Amino acid sequence: MATYSVHVKWGKEKFDNVEVNTAEPPELFQAQLFALSGVPIQRQKIMGKGKTLKNDSWDGFTLKDGMTLLMMGSNELVPTPQLGTKFIEDMSSTELNKASSFPAGLTNLGNTCYMNATIQCLKNVPELKQALERYDGKLNIGSIMSMPSDAITISLRDLYNVMNKTSAAVPPIMFLQVLHAVFPHFAEKSEQGGFMQQDANECWTQLIRMLQQRLPPLKTDSDSNLHKSSFIDQYFGISFKTVLKCDETDLEAETTLTEHFYQLSCFISQDIKYLNSGLKSRLKETITKASPVLGKDALYTKSSLISRLPAYLTIQFVRFFYKEKEKVNAKILKDIKFPMTLDVFELCSSELQEKLKPMRDKFKEEEDKRANEKLLQISIAANNKKLPFEFSDDIGSNNSGYYELSAVLTHRGRSSSSGHYVAWIRKQEGLDEWLMCDDDNVYAVTSEDILKLSGGGDWHCAYVLLYSPKSLIVADEKNDHH
C-alpha cells in the first residue's frame, strides 16, 4: 500500500500529478477525477496497462509514479428519453431538480447531513463562491495535515464547481475525506461502524475558521479602506465595543476593548420569545474575573455594542446544553420567532448608528416614494439600480443595519449528536422563493414554511440563521427620462 502520483488522460484533456492512495478505496480516486472533470463516478472507466480499475478494489491494478492512466466517460447530462408527459408526482428528486433548475443536492454519506446543510447554506453567499473561484491550487492529498486550511478551501471550491455543473445529487466524497483528515473527531464511528452524527454549527464555525486563514481580502484603490486580514473578516466579521466595569469597587477604572466574532449568539431563556430580544439580552451581562485592584475574583458588568456590521450576519440559537446525567447535548425546543427582515440598529454603538443613518434615510425615502406611486398608480421606473450595501471605506460591511434572511440551518431531534440537519435557502436575492435542501433532495417551499422553523416542537427547528444585506433598489436617474 502506497501513495502514487499519476497522470490521467481524458479525451483531449490531461490531469497531471493526481495523487492516488491505494490504502483508500478506488472511489476516493474516482471522486478526485469527478471534481476535475465532472464525469460522474458511475460513468468513469479507468484503464492502465491493459487493466480496468474496479470500483471496490485495487486488486490486479498496478500503479507506478509518473504513469499515465486513461479515463473514458462523458460529463454531459444524459438526454431524457421521450416517454410522453411525466407528472410531478411521478418524478424522482433528480428529475424534479432538473425540470425546475434547482441547485444540486448532496448525497448523505452516512450521518453527514450536518456537513451537507452547512455547505448548502454557505453556498448562498455569492461573494464567497467568487472568492473560492479566485483561489488557486490543486488538492494535494499528501499535504492535507501540513496545510489543512488550504485543503479545506480547495476541496470546498472544487465541490461547489461540481455542484454548479449539474442538477443531480453530488456525492461530496472528497470534501468529506478532507474534513475527516483535518478534524478527526468528525470521523468518529458508532458501535455499529457507521459515522456518528456531528454538530452542524461546529462544522460551520470550523469551515469559516479555515477559510479565514486562506481567502485573501478584497482590495480597492482607496487608501482609506479599513484593512482586514481576510475575505472572511470583511464579509462575516462582527466587531463589538465592550466596556468592563467592576461592581465591587469604584477605585478600578472602566476597561474598554474591541472584540471580534463571526457569529452572534441568541441565548434562550424563559422570557425570550423573539430573536431581537434574545440578542439584546446578552448585550449587558454580569461576569466574574480577577480584579487587579482588589486582588481577588470580583463581579463585573460587561456592556457590549456592535461597532462594525458585516454584509452577512450569522446567528446561532444556543439550543443545546450538556446533560451530565445522560452525557448528551440536550436540546431546548422553545419557540423563538425570527423575522424575514432583520433590523439590528438597536444593538449598535452610537458611533455606528450615526454612520448607518444616511442609508436608513434613503430606505425610508424609497419606501415612501413607492407607497405614493402605488397610491397614485404611477408606474415605477424600469431602469433601476442597486445601491452599495457597504461603506466605501469598509469592503464587506453593512451600511444600513437592515438584513434579509438568506438561509436557515435546522435540526430535528432531541440532541446535537442525533437527529437530522437540513438547509433552507432563499432561491434568489429579493425574491420570496425558497428551497429545502434535504441531502440529495431539493424541494420548493414557501416563506410560511420558513417561519414555521422557529421551534416549539419536534418539527425542524432553526439552529443557525444566515442574513444577507438588504438591497436598496432605486430608479437610475441618469437613464430615467420620465
Regions found by a protein language model. Give the residues of each.
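UBL (ubiquitin/ubiquitin-like) substrate-recognition surfaces
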Residues: 1-482
